[in-house]
Amino acid sequence: MAHKKAGGSTRNGRDSESKRLGVKRFGGESVLAGNIIVRQRGTKFHAGVNVGIGRDHTLFALTDGKVKFEVKGPKNRKFISIEG
């Protein structure tokens, strides 16, 4: 009789759920106050004019207007602002 030994249990086969990070509203898009602009880990993008920052570094609009991305400062940081 042909026999095959039972396979051992594997220690792989797990992965974490994706966190859906990234830019949610792009440059030139209209936003309403409270709209999320970017979900991020750390400050990859910094809050500019009329943009608030949540405790998980989420950037959101404080006023209605259009999204503007800009690079400024001595460290060439990326800022996101809302233009009324």
UniProtKB/Swiss-Prot annotation:
Gene3D superfamilies noted in UniProt? 2.40.50.100
* HAMAP family xrefs: Ribosomal_bL27 (MF_00539)
Q: What segment(s) does the record annotate as region Disordered?
A: 1-22
**Which of UniProt's keywords are assigned here?**
Ribonucleoprotein, Ribosomal protein
Organism placement in taxonomy: Bacteria, Pseudomonadati, Pseudomonadota, Gammaproteobacteria, Alteromonadales
Please give the Gene Ontology molecular function terms for this protein. Answer: structural constituent of ribosome
GO BP annotation list: translation
Q: Which domain of life is it from?
A: Bacteria
| Stated name of the protein | Large ribosomal subunit protein bL27
> Which terms in the GO cellular component ontology are assigned?
cytosolic large ribosomal subunit
Gene (name only): rpmA
Family note: Belongs to the bacterial ribosomal protein bL27 family.
